[in-house]
Amino acid sequence: MKAGEGLMEEIAKEYLRNGIAKWGVLYIDGHFWPYYGMYLISKGWHEVRKIPMKGSYIFIGVDEKFTPWIFLVRPSSEDLLQKIPEIIEKAKNKGREAGISEEQIENLIVIFDREGYSAELYRELEGSWNLNKKRKAIFISWAKYSDKWVNEICEEKFDKSVVINYEIQESEELKYFETERSMSKYGKIRTIVIQSGAEKKRFAIYTNGSEKEIKAEIIVQLICKRWGEENLIKELLYKHMIDYSPGYETEELKEQPMIDNPEITKLKKERGNLISKINLMKIKIADNLLASEEGKKSKEKREAEETEIKAEIAILNHQVLKINEEIEKLPKEVRYDEVHSGEKLVKLNYERKRFLDCVKIFVYNMERKMCEYLSKYYDKKKEIWPALMMIVRRGAYIKLEGRKLKVILRRFKNQEIDYAARHLCEELNQMKPYTSDRFHLPIHYEVM
């Protein structure tokens, strides 16, 4: 394991140990980070632009309150389906090291979007592929390909309701009913269908958790709040520049990836053109036959034209046969560098970025914690973050008195901000902060 990866895991453990992140619910999502440089790296799918692009992925795990505490930085050759089990395993290991009980570890609830919809992934999380059949986690996910059957359900079946209490937006009441569906390559799966809004839009939710383990109301609450993670990623993107990388270093790949043989693609295109020509000629024969029956064309002329067309079809069929033989001789996949005149794909070294992202996520979490303290003295919830920024970015004087370092903020004209700033300083002073150098001088904050 590289140093950056180890640092990320150790910080994740400390988030759990110090109560900054809460164990129990883990939302997992990925963010595509595009790369516009000159190096040849693998491509991924840009969800916003809907095109393949060179880039990498940041996979983030957050708790029920959307506190980011575990994340991975990976090349775009690794997707969310592969990373969900890895993040779960890392999270459980760090949970054990942080002192979480084994019962709580095994009852971890994992929530992800439709991108994680996969029978193979569901079976892996259920433990179907493990020798000991041990479940990895309780998963909750939106179902795919359910648009048709959910709208065929009778309105009367939606006889239960749950109120979703969001962090900022107004609460919403949803109707739902519980059933069971058969999923290809997985089998029977617990399903909850919800109906929302005036338009009565319907969506299906899949989970492997039993009724005893997790109630339907909680399942609906958890997955409907999943947008909180999307908002978190946007905040990390725009306020903390999570897409930034402090330089790019590359590493050679152990093996060049195998790609579809372009010669086969070229031959298949050529074969398709020939088959289209054959079909057009067959249509021409049918048209001639109709024209002859209607008396528009003599039988002799039709037969002469038909003989000529059939000869052309025979030639084209022979060409198609030769192309098929050529395709069979060629390998289906070839190495990337063999196709691109020796140019090789490389992978980016993410060590600097991992270290920097650890700092950024730590700063984000500390800002959230300070907002919690500030909210005791500043009651405008929607303005709490701007108020905090006004305080922490305020000009200050530093004064050393004896062995105490005083940080003195200039007072604020706004009385509400001034009041909140003074009490925030008191909260910080109660934590007994000190300088991180060898002197360990006590720090005292005040507003004057």
Regions found by a protein language model. Name each.
Residues 1-62:
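Active-site-proximal, Lys/Arg-enriched surface segment
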Residues 167-172, 262-448:
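A short, flexible helix-boundary coil/loop motif
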Residues 46-101, 201-204:
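Electropositive, glycine- and tryptophan-enriched low-complexity nucleic-acid-binding patches
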Residues 223-259, 313, 317-323, 327:
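C-terminal, active-site-flanking charged/polar segments
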Residues 145, 211, 225, 229, ...:
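Short, well-ordered loop/turn and helix-capping segments at boundaries between secondary-structure elements
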Residues 128-229, 237, 402-409, 414-423, ...:
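An anionic, glycine-rich sequence signature occurring as long contiguous blocks
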Residues 78-148:
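Domain-level cores of phosphate- or acyl-group-handling catalytic modules
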Residues 1, 22-33, 66, 107-117, ...:
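Short, conserved catalytic/metal-binding motifs centered on acidic residues
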